[in-house]
Amino acid sequence: MNDISMMGYPGMGQQQPQPQQAQQPQQQPISMQPHTMMNMMNTNLPPPGMMMGGAGSNTGNENMINHGLMSGNPVSGIPNNNSHQLLDQLINKNPNNMGIPQQQQDSLAAQMQLPMGGMPMGNGSAHNGNVGMNNNNTGGNNNIPMGNANVLRNNNIIGNLGGSSLAGGNMNSGMPGISTFGNTPGQLAAPPIQPNANANNPMYHPHLEDPSLMNNPIWKLQLQLATVSAQSVGQPNIYARQNAMKKYLATQVPPQNQTQQQAQAQSQIAETSKSLVDCTKQALMDIMAPDDSKLKGMSAPNTASTTTNSTISTPTTSKIDMNNSREQPSTPSLLLQHKKLSQYSIDEDDEVENRMVAPKDTKYNDQIWHAIDLSNLQIFNISPNLMKYDFLTRLYLNGNGLESIPSSIRNLKNLRVLDLSHNKLKELPKEIGNCYQLKYLYFFDNQITTLPWELGNLCNIQFLGCEGNPLDKELLKILTEKSFTGLIFYLRDNRPEVPYPHDRKFIEINADGEPEKEYDTVQEAERNLSSDMQKKSFTMLSYNTLCQHYATPKMYRYTPSWALSWDYRREKLKEQILNFNTDIICLQEVEAKTFEDFWQPLLEKHGYTGLFHAKTRAKTMQSKDSKKVDGCCAFYKTSKFKMLFKECVDFSGLWMKHKKFQRTEDYLNRAMNKDNVAIVMKLQHIQSGEIMWLVTTHLHWDPKFNDVKTFQVGVLLDHMETLLKEQNPKQDVKKYPLVICGDLNSYLSSSVYELFSTGRVQHHHDGKDRDFGYFSEDNFSHNLALKSSYNCIGELAFTNFTPSFTDVIDYIWFSSQALRVRGLLGEVDSEYVSNFIGFPNDKFPSDHIPLLGRYEFLKSNNTQNSNSGSRKV
């Protein structure tokens, strides 16, 4: 964009060309023209304390938040101090000590003496009207040169740096709970640089005690990135500045006649704009790179070319010297171990970026900025209110005086990058473990001695920066031997047991459908059940057991490896199900072979008999492979029920046999290839003589196919109506005892829930503009009076618990005019759940929890020999 005023800076419109100095070349690349560079720095500099992450934005307009202070707008002709200091850093303090040509430096320095509009710069008093700006002319001396890192560490100037002239006292006005100290209103104190007393302490820098660590590639990476981090100390909002520079450079096209000297200078500026996160990605990409990439002439793309979309992109950059260590005999297994443990590619797009370019249909996607940069602002306290910004993906708190982080950081579950380096932290809050999407966690140069076990939840971690802390030697050993992911897995697998305070309570429901009494266990409730209630009621369980083929270490990285093993989970499932001792057991996600070899023989020993139906894809496979396909199964106690009818159905097959079947485009393209199934049983309750119908199913999982789920339920309910009418044409189908349970993969707000609860789907977005023939024309309507079992006490907090999804998707529906709920298994203890980011774990062997209820038959003549079509309720 040529007009700077269009980028959120109205006082900086296009300027008339300035006369060029005689000694300058007639043509300069745009990135090297002094006036243009000054405009660029003012233009793209985000507001203080904020760095935005709107995708695809290069203007900085739509995704910037202006606090009214330090915005970069010139006030009364006063130039922006941020621009001068940043330009000074870019010219004189480049990281590779490869200076910009002296002629160019002189020209840029001369330009720095002029305001943006070409008017003469006022003296210090002219800044009095520039509210929130610090005109400390000596502040620039507090900045650490972006040069040789050894100078930084050897001269003990890494920690406790003073304020910069860029740090206005009101820099974060409008930000919740930011506490800073300053000498006067509108200014931060600029104390002298204090030496870092721990710079030569081997407890903080173990390579000083054990020089062999210098040959360890993991520790070399720690030192390399700790050096990069140290270079930013004392430079307020360093991430925001670097991001602004990258966005500017991405818009520039080098001229064709660019000299080598000019190209070198431009490359130098691009190098300066690289952040710690960029350097981390560069290093990790090098570790993950193929060995023969150099031979093929391959090199990773330049960072600047891959970071134009947003501040949360994952660019790749050129290789570093660690690639050479791959050839050393002592390092290949270590480097490859990181690759093996990571199980994902460093350069794959962030999930959040994919959401940003997708249709904006959520509150999260309407948010246009996702990062806050509070680096090097002399902040000594962070209010928990900051943690209410749960949409944040990046939070930079490095270079302050923080001694603690609020436990409410657990709310930032979208966080990808967290920089806590160069503070005074003695521990990390265990709640950071809830930020399971963290990829880059930095806490260089603090006072941390150990890591909370909860960090084992950080299953997506790609780098953990810990150098400069007196960290426990055992943890350091694991880090240097097994890399970052190995350390996380160690914390995950060796976490002490979290006590389970109590079993899920069983809630007794009275005849009016209201909770009456709570029992500590299902067994206790059973012991207190009256003999009359036992004769006219039954219990049933519905449980998605998580098929072992889906429970892979890659999918469930947050679960300890021993707790994820099928042997352990199978025994836990067995223990749970047998302890519940229900009259009916319905299971989903059961492998065919597991049913035959484990569940069927086990439950037959305990007085059950059952039926299994695999998903339809098993029909297309050879016998051996078909045994690995999962499906649904239903068991009943032979002492309680007698089976009168059974049927295994698949939804596509039912619809194709329907008398009103239509081959619509949506059916053919969206529903026909889904292989979900259901089991239907007609059972007679032996003690009461009542007849009931039992259905268990597992609907399609993908939320992009909610219309297909509605279609599947519509087919199922239509089929049940047909069966009920065939069995007894004179009886109202509403008065048949019917229970439908399973994993419906549908929210409470879904069209599936609406269809079950109201009998039709009316103008619901899930099925909008979809054509499933007869069902769509009739709004999928049915005449069954169904009610969710948990409706009388309120649906549970969740039935499926994973880091990325926690909600109710499992249900037990019953015919409310023929059955009455008399008891329900309650929710999992919320305090216990707060210690985890998902199931399975050592106590819960599936990512779903079981649903359990007791159901009473209402008085009726609904017996096997009944011909009556009516009864009173």
From Swiss-Prot:
It catalyses: Exonucleolytic cleavage of poly(A) to 5'-AMP. Mg(2+) binds at E589. Its cofactor is Mg(2+). It is an enzyme of class 3 (hydrolase). GO terms for molecular function: metal ion binding; poly(A)-specific ribonuclease activity; RNA binding. GO terms for biological process: DNA replication; DNA replication checkpoint signaling; nuclear-transcribed mRNA poly(A) tail shortening; positive regulation of transcription elongation by RNA polymerase II; transcription elongation by RNA polymerase II; traversing start control point of mitotic cell cycle. InterPro entries: CCR4/nocturin_mRNA_transcr, Endo/exonu/phosph_ase_sf, Endo/exonuclease/phosphatase, Leu-rich_rpt, Leu-rich_rpt_typical-subtyp, LRR_dom_sf. It is found in: Cytoplasm; Nucleus. Keywords: Cytoplasm, Exonuclease, Hydrolase, Leucine-rich repeat, Magnesium, Metal-binding, Nuclease, Nucleus, Repeat, RNA-binding, Transcription, Transcription regulation. The keyword 4Fe-4S does not apply. One of its GO terms (cellular component) is CCR4-NOT core complex. Belongs to the CCR4/nocturin family. This is CCR4-Not complex 3'-5'-exoribonuclease subunit Ccr4. It comes from Candida glabrata (strain ATCC 2001 / BCRC 20586 / JCM 3761 / NBRC 0622 / NRRL Y-65 / CBS 138).
